[in-house]
């Protein structure tokens, strides 16, 4: 077996694993020793790609669950990301980001980490310290709901209120805020607790804020009857679906992450 330390694709992509090879690291005989397991893994991945089935994979409630994360990079009418869903996100971006001055994302695990990584890569650590012109009109972005830290809730709220007060004192009117809770089940404790806290506190400050909400959750499964979905229906909030077969660590490549990317 030839381990040259690099895997190159025709597209130009190169995976360099040379730092993993060596006398006290991985050797060719180590790969040969687990070759049967590797072949089994390759067969299993091929099955996932073919029909979305992974033998023995169960959902949290113990029921068989499809696995569709391999389909996320491909945009097609029968995949999670369709031409229509991408256009819907683009339209939402134009409508919402252009009219909001602050956006707060609420999520935990994959519904938070992937979005935070996207934001840090494209906006950097000091985005919210930039002036509106430097942000090219895009809103300030905040994250919460990944823990139950009441002090963090209060300190971030104080900062948002402080900025809104300065804006109003300058005669520039109310601050328009978008709240975006992201939870597949619609019942995630940390996410819902943070969302409800900020929603109620900001709504109390009627002279300072105009508050809107967009909900990202499972609209077809059990979550469709969750209190969050019921609130979305009652208040006519815009919603985006989290479809089955995509776990939290991969959801950044579907609506939960793409809404941040948009």
Show the residue positions of the predicted features:
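Glycine-rich phosphate-binding loops that contact phosphosugars or nucleotide phosphates
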Residues: 98-262
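Extended, charge-enriched "interface" segments that sit outside catalytic cores
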Residues: 1-101
């Amino acid at each position: 077996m030839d381990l040259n330390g690099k895997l190159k694709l025709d597209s130009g992509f190169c995976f360099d694993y040379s730092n993993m090879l060596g006398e006290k690291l991985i050797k060719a005989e180590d790969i040969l020793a687990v070759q049967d397991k590797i072949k089994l893994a390759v067969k299993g991945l091929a099955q996932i790609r073919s029909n979305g089935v992974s033998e023995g994979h169960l959902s949290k409630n113990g029921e068989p669950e499809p696995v569709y994360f391999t389909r996320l990079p491909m945009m097609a009418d029968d995949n999670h990301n369709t031409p229509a869903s991408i256009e819907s996100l683009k339209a939402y971006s134009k409508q919402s980001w252009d009219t909001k001055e602050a956006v707060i994302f609420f999520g935990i695990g994959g519904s938070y980490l992937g979005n935070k990584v996207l934001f840090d890569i494209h906006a950097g650590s000091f985005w919210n310290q930039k002036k509106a012109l430097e942000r090219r009109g895009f809103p300030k972005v905040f994250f919460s709901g990944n823990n139950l830290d009441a002090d963090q809730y209060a300190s971030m709220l104080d900062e948002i209120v402080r900025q809104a007060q300065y804006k109003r004192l300058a005669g520039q009117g109310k601050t328009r805020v978008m709240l975006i809770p992201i939870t597949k089940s619609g019942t995630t404790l940390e996410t819902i607790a943070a969302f409800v806290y900020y929603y109620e506190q900001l709504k109390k400050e009627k002279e300072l804020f105009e508050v809107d909400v967009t909900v990202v959750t499972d609209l077809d499964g059990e979550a469709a009857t969750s209190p969050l979905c019921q609130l979305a229906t009652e208040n006519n909030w815009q919603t985006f679906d989290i479809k089955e077969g995509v776990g939290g660590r991969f959801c950044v490549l579907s609506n939960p992450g793409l809404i941040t990317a948009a």
